[in-house]
Design a protein with these regions (language model features):
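N-terminal secretory signal peptides that target proteins for export/translocation
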Residues: 1-12
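Sec-dependent N-terminal signal peptides
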Residues: 13-21
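N-terminal signal peptide c-region/cleavage motif recognized by signal peptidases
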Residues: 28-30
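C-terminal functional module detector
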Residues: 34-70, 74, 81-114, 119-125, ...
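The substrate-binding groove and active-site-proximal loops of carbohydrate-active enzymes
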Residues: 59-64, 158-172, 218-230, 328-338
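Alpha-helical scaffolding segments of alpha/beta enzyme cores, especially the outer helices
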Residues: 72-75, 173-181, 234, 238
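Alpha-helix N-cap/helix-start capping residues at coil-to-helix junctions, especially the first residue
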Residues: 129, 135-154, 189, 200-276, ...
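Mid-domain alpha/beta scaffold segments of enzyme catalytic cores
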Residues: 137-140, 171, 176-178, 190
Length: 580
């Protein structure tokens, strides 16, 4: 297999100080999928994908006029153009390597019925089919989406109360159709499709959704929905019962938009041993960036917002954008508790054999326009959930273009990609395809000078460390140069996680390549600790600034962010001390 970094630096180039940086002669191969599959080896390929995609089969996409199908979404991910609701055509500048279409399980029945001959004479289908459009989307969203999943308890649509057998049959047939389209698009060694769907838990507008991703074509017979299975424990119990390893079925449940969760779904003080075990098994990842904002971190107090955590924030109350000063101290702390950094910090309290909240990081788009991987700030014109046209999209300018997930996999097959996800050898980006490796050096070995990548532990791994650890961060820029590399360190002591942001390297003019070695001189082997890298690009124009400039109307939006600093977040490496 090709080597991502080969002879990046001569040994003489590495600084004798704790921090060593070299950017001469490095190169990064784009893996050949066919060679990877034909000649498996210890080297891994960096693959790019999107694990959060909606099409017309999701009701919240359909009401805004999305007509594209899962098959259309897969073709778009492979590089084909797609015509959107407003008649414009979009296309990726580079194909993706893998995609999962994750339709909302709750409305597979309704969208199927309304797309079939059964729709004739049904008032709800007539209402949807005649009105669905960017202009009417918000009203239809309130009529059908809000009424089913945002109350204290989920409620089925009236259509399914009146005729549950019709809805059950259509939910099954629609899920089967998604599977068939997913199988038809699968091209092992070139393009992988993963089966999945979204469980849409939203009590009282508090967001605790999970994307369910499967390892193979052995999947649950039904798409598990929030209406029938209204708690995360019920979701896991149903997966335990219907997705068994003996039947070659394995799944992950990936939470997203924890920035909109207001603290729910991650309270562990009253959790049963069974629930803790299920969380450790199923929730090995968290989606930390997508079109509804970034969920990496919040500071301890709202007035302390700084560059550390103030990237693409999307603060909400009952799913509506809200300013930081609108929250009480208690509300702020509750909201902060479900951001990714707080969650993995809380997970440091658990012993090696109990690993809830030990999660790696991914990004995806959450597109509702069947456009996986479409994250280009220069051409993205707003979320499909905002409507079309400048005025509609700019009203929702707090939304983001979305992210991607980078996976270090043995080969481009769904099983190999799933295994990398389960091992957390993955990372998130806010859109750019930034090359990133993060490893714990073996006995202070010089990974920057090595022919291959052979760390003692790599991103996503749990280990036990007895001496001051040396880490290596290898980075290759995408299109925009890299300007800084940081390590975020969390240390568990005095019953809480203490956070540090450590700047390893900063080059304002930017660079295309970097390899950094850093020793943690403050390491305490008695304390559970994690480290993850964060890489930032040079500042570039944000999509909203591009759109308002094209319209000649930027002066109307003086508070709108004009730029952003795109970035990548590596999954952590954990040190968990042995217990007696």
């Amino acid at each position: 297999m090709p080597k991502p970094f080969t002879k990046a630096c001569k040994k003489s180039d590495i600084s004798q100080l704790i921090l060593g940086v070299c950017m001469l002669g490095a190169y990064w191969f784009t893996p050949s999928a066919s060679a990877t599959c034909d000649r498996p080896s210890d080297e891994k390929a960096l693959l790019w994908g999107d694990l959060h995609v909606h099409t017309s089969y999701s009701l919240d996409a359909s009401v805004f006029g999305t007509l594209a199908t899962p098959a259309d979404a897969y073709r778009f991910a492979k590089g084909d153009p797609l015509t959107r609701t407003d008649g414009s055509t979009v296309q990726l500048d580079r194909p993706l390597d893998f995609v999962a279409v994750t339709e909302h399980a709750e409305w597979l029945d309704f969208t199927s019925i309304c797309d079939s001959p059964s729709a004739e004479g049904l008032a709800d289908c007539d209402n949807l089919l005649t009105k669905r459009s960017p202009q009417n989307g918000s009203a239809l969203f309130g009529e059908y989406v809000v009424t089913t999943i945002t109350g204290a308890e989920p409620q089925p649509l009236s259509l399914c109360v009146d005729d549950p057998e019709l809805c059950e049959a259509n939910a099954l047939s629609r899920w089967q159709s998604v599977q068939e389209q997913t199988e038809a698009a699968y091209d092992p060694c070139t393009f992988s499709t993963l089966h999945g769907y979204e469980w849409s838990h939203t009590p009282n507008f508090r967001h605790a959704h999970r994307n369910v991703i499967f390892r193979s074509d052995s999947v649950t017979k039904e798409a598990i929905d929030y209406i029938r299975f209204p708690t995360v424990e019920a979701l896991w119990d149903e997966l335990d019962a219907t997705c068994r390893r003996d039947d070659q079925c394995e799944a992950l449940t990936i939470p997203h938009n924890t920035n909109m969760g207001n603290g729910i779904s991650f309270e562990l003080t009253q959790a049963s041993p069974k629930s803790l075990q299920q969380r450790a098994q199923y929730e090995r990842l968290i989606e930390i960036t997508q079109e509804k904002g970034t969920s990496e971190c919040l500071p301890s107090r709202a007035e302390n917002l700084s560059e550390d955590c103030e990237f693409e924030l999307f603060l909400t109350r009952q799913s509506r954008p809200t300013d930081p000063d609108a929250f009480t101290e208690q509300e702020w702390q509750q909201m902060r508790s479900t951001y990714a950094r707080s969650l993995v910090g809380k997970g440091l309290a658990f012993a090696p054999d109990e690993a809830p909240l030990r999660m790696g990081f991914i990004g995806s788009t959450d597109t509702h326009a069947a456009t996986p991987g479409y994250v280009d700030e220069a051409s993205w014109s707003g979320s499909a959930l905002a409507g079309t046209g400048f005025d509609a999209s700019i009203r929702s300018n707090a939304w983001s273009a979305g992210g991607l997930v980078g996976v270090w996999a043995e080969e481009n097959t769904r099983e190999a990609i799933f295994d990398a996800l389960a091992k957390r050898e993955v990372y998130a980006t806010s859109g750019p395809r930034i090359g990133l490796r993060f490893g714990l050096n073996e006995d202070d070995a010089e990974l920057c000078t090595a022919d291959g990548w052979m760390p003692r532990a790599t991103m996503g791994e749990v280990t036990q460390i007895t001496s001051k650890p040396m880490f290596t961060v290898q980075v290759q820029a995408d299109i925009t140069p890299i300007t800084s590399i940081e390590i975020i360190k969390l240390t568990y002591r005095d019953n809480r996680a203490h956070e540090e942001v450590i700047l390893l390297w900063h080059k304002p003019e930017g660079a295309a390549l970097a390899c950094i070695q850093w020793t943690d001189e403050q390491f305490d082997s008695a304390s559970a600790t994690l480290w993850y890298p964060r890489v930032k690009e040079r500042t570039t124009p944000r999509w909203s600034a591009v759109q308002c400039a094209a319209a000649g109307r930027c002066d109307e939006f003086p508070q709108m962010d004009a730029t952003l600093q795109e970035r990548a977040w590596g999954s952590p490496i954990w040190h968990i001390p042995a217990t007696d």
